[in-house]
């Protein structure tokens, strides 16, 4: 084997069905343009860095075994707008630590119990008192023994009740000592003991119940609700809550969970000699705590404050399963999750120059895939990893079994990424989309895409730590207010990338011009640069002077408000944009190249430049565009609207007056007259018909005689011829 070769475990479930001896190892994937290239159990060669596996020949027929595992579908990792921050922060930064402590203090300030023990109530009868030595009784007298029979309810309600035995009377603020009177008698310093106990048990104030019906995490959701996604608010089974419970579960399992700065501040499970708080509920008595601190948390320490929140947010953990994860990962997750909310709320989302760090997609992809491949739980479920050919580029992917176990596998992956949020967030992670031929699986952390987007407070240039194969990247973080609109964001960033390219090319020689293109795999842009230093200096000068940025932004906004796609998006009143440019000063294929500076050879590291956030009022610009538009043509009326309205009224009245108008009563009377006339005509018609019938009956006889006479005369005339004949 050549130098740099290594052996890795096979991460696929056997060879493809169409594999033949000497054939291609690339596996076609339905729904994805390209193939899957799995790792091989015997790699014939790889790069020195191990970043890309090498294609290998197929094994002989004797090595081919039947596929025993279920079919797995490749899922590539995609970071959409809501899953990514273009800049991230340093966990050890003093300002970050201060904001985290401030955030948690604001949540728990009404629930913290002071270390005062001068008003504690000990329920001891005469026999119990006799068992105590004189020095102990004297110390109890110094604390203050209160007789319930001689005290009113108001006085008793503000006390912590210390009981040495559990009887039928349980007060909401009861501390029970399992060791009994003997334990109390053995204490060398009663007052100091209880002061220490109360210090390391952050409970509610004395005048309220010590049992948490609502945890501090619920208070955080209420106080900082706008920083959480709408479906996250009020829920308990999300990222932060589950991680805090995992922390207490580890402590309950005996794992050391401590502040990395103050290692003696640890959470541990209660021992039989520790006091246990009880509360009287509808269904009996409940333990409000299973955990205690080995030492009081250090004030103004953000991680100690996070441990306080974990303790006060814990419930009964008897039902929980084993948590197999290092507590440092969980502590990092809880701390950075709270820090993101704290920076967004108190820091207005802006990071100071010293607190700014670069982000990197490729690093996060590698971390997620490595976490999945090393997870024994996911391996048992059949989840593996592989390389997938997408658009002629090999990408690392997660292979998830398709079938009944699919949703179980996705849930397990979601849980793993939630627990490792702290590590991933160090590089900008806020969530991920797993894309397969069957669709998209969205894994979110519950943080709001608008209110938790971090930006730089000032423009800065720093070293870019990256594992990317791309040399030059342009990223933008665009937020629309008051409603986030994907169409406006996509259109504006496309227009801005075009204007950005024009401004750069206008400032450099023709041979140094760049061509900015949209990445086919994510929301970023990339470009090639023949002279990276020249391009980088030009961009830095653009940001420094501001003139080119003004022109670039102005033209992009003008085209945005007049775009047919966005002109109907009237719900967007303003837009905010941050730009980051990441560049390698040396091309990735020629990293040995050096630059001579002041007579010395010096390797330039990859750099990134981030701008502050620019905010533009779209509503005012939209109004101005509408006023200046050619479609906006005011019409000057010869008459006012009031005058025209009066003319319309007069026109109608004139038209009605020109007709023979009659009232409703006149119309009724006319109708009645017509009816009467009709009835009279009908009556006359009936009379005429009757008279005509009688006349016909009287004239019957005369008519017959007349007819006879006429017939006779005719016959006579016919019998006697006239003279002429």
Swiss-Prot record:
Residues annotated as transmembrane: none
Biased composition range(s): Acidic residues: 687-709
Basic and acidic residues: compositionally biased ranges: 675-686
Region (Disordered): 1-26, 666-725
Bias kind Polar residues: ranges: 7-16
Protein name: Non-structural protein 4
Originating species: Rice gall dwarf virus (RGDV)
